[in-house]
Structures are given as structure tokens and as C-alpha cells.
Design a protein with these regions (language model features):
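A short secondary-structure junction signal
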Residues: 85-91
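A contiguous, mid-domain pocket- or channel-lining segment that forms the substrate-recognition surface
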Residues: 94-98
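Conserved catalytic core of two-metal-ion nucleotidyltransferases
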Residues: 8, 12, 18-82, 103-112, ...
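The conserved acidic donor/metal-binding loop of glycosyltransferases
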Residues: 1-3
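"Short basic amphipathic alpha-helical interaction patches in structured regions
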Residues: 17-18, 90
Length: 228
């Protein structure tokens, strides 16, 4: 699995050129574009590889216009957190609440992974969210992400990540500078503070999990890649 992370300014610049730079086999999929702007999956843009297939056809795949049935790379956005721990927590809570509202526009909701309290929270927000146009929910999410763009604070967060990763907090110096790093047969740009970033997200990332947990979570035995 590979992801790309941008600062807000970088992402806005990227969007201006991406359509003309991508080959015909790839496409930028905006999160507000599914089902005529009426279907929610998440708040994450992604680049899909159109000559691939990951799942059999289904109502769920059709609901998302078949766009989620391809290999993709997630595009995450770093935004500024407000100064002060309490203000930062309020920002994260607002994102979680907006995400809950948007869940009312998903194809289906799986409550099995939630505790009773979270089932009530998610179910209530999703029910309320059905009454709000999805376009308005996306506007609220972006407004929250941008509300602290003039903050003097040094902390950043992934504003379009799923709620259980909103805790990830990065220092400005870790992620606003980049270095070139060798990776297999190529060279990639990575955050200057790559080590503290990895530790913030994964903890001791050099230690393997127990053998029974060494199972990929982002893979499928059904992946097909087409030559033509």
C-alpha cells in the first residue's frame, strides 16, 4: 500500500495540473463525485488505475460508479491545527461529527465494529445526515479543515483521514520539508522528518507484529491488471 500526503497549498497546486499530467490509464477521483455527488465513501481523493479490477460487480460497486473497483493511491491533506490542546480537540471532534453525518449517504453501514456507545453516536449522526445534502456536508468538512489556515501553531493533522486516525499529529518541521530517498529501483520524495512521522502513526515500526497478525489489510486475491 502506498499513500501520498500533501500540504494544503501543495494539493491545490496539484489539482490544477493533475488532469493534463496523468496518462489515459489513470484518473483523479474526487470524493464528492460518486453517484452524481449523492454517494459518500470517504473524504479522500484518490488516483485510480483504470486498467485494473479488485472486486466482482455488485450493487455497492455500482453505487460508487465502479470507481472503487480499481487499484488506487490515496491522497491525504495536511492542514493546520489551532494553537492549544482544547482547540485542537474541538477541531478533531467537529471532523468526526461531520464524518458521521456523511455516513448517512454511504451504500451501507457496518455497525459490527462499533461499541454500543459508538453505534448510538454513528447511527444518530448518519440518520441526521440523510436529511442534509451531501454537497453541504462536503462544504462543512472543507470549512473545518481550513478554519485554522492562518494559525501560528506548529502542529498539522490529516484533515481528510478517517476518524480513527485523526489523532495523528505532526510537527510542521517534520512534514513541510522533503528529502529524496532511494526505494527499490527509484527515488521518492519523503518527509524530512520521516522517522518521527512513522513513529507517530505506527509506533515502533521496525518491530514485526506477532506472526498471527502478519496479514495484509490492503490486499485482495482478486486483483486483476489488464495490459489493454
Amino acid at each position: 500500500d502506498a499513500d501520498i500526503v500533501f500540504t494544503r497549498n501543495q494539493f491545490e497546486a496539484f489539482k490544477k495540473v493533475v488532469k493534463r499530467e496523468l496518462p489515459d490509464t489513470m484518473e483523479l477521483v474526487e470524493p464528492g463525485s460518486f453517484h452524481g455527488g449523492k454517494a459518500f465513501y470517504d473524504f479522500t481523493p484518490r488516483i485510480i488505475y483504470k486498467k485494473s479490477r479488485m472486486h466482482p460487480d455488485s450493487d455497492k460497486m455500482d453505487y460508487y460508479d465502479g470507481k472503487l473497483n480499481h487499484l488506487w493511491v490515496d491522497l491525504f491533506i495536511l492542514d493546520k491545527l489551532p494553537k492549544g490542546k482544547a482547540a485542537a480537540e474541538i477541531t478533531r471532534f467537529l471532523h468526526k461529527a461531520i464524518y458521521g453525518l456523511a455516513m448517512g449517504h454511504r451504500h451501507d453501514l457496518d455497525y459490527s465494529k462499533y461499541s454500543l456507545m459508538h453505534k448510538i453516536f454513528v447511527g444518530g449522526l448518519a440518520t441526521a445526515g440523510k436529511l442534509i445534502p451531501l454537497k453541504a456536508i462536503f462544504a462543512m468538512q472543507k470549512a473545518i479543515a481550513l478554519k485554522d489556515r492562518h494559525s501560528k501553531g506548529d502542529l498539522r493533522y490529516y484533515s481528510n483521514y478517517q476518524p480513527d486516525y485523526l489523532y495523528v499529529t505532526l510537527h510542521k518541521d517534520w512534514c513541510e520539508g522533503v528529502i529524496d530517498a532511494p526505494f527499490e529501483d527509484t527515488t521518492l520524495m519523503i518527509p524530512k522528518g520521516w522517522d518521527p512521522v512513522l513513529k507517530e502513526i505506527y509506533g515502533n515500526y521496525m518491530q514485526l507484529p506477532p506472526e498471527e497478525q502478519r496479514i495484509p489489510t490492503h490486499s485482495s486475491l482478486q486483483i486483476q491488471v489488464y495490459d489493454e
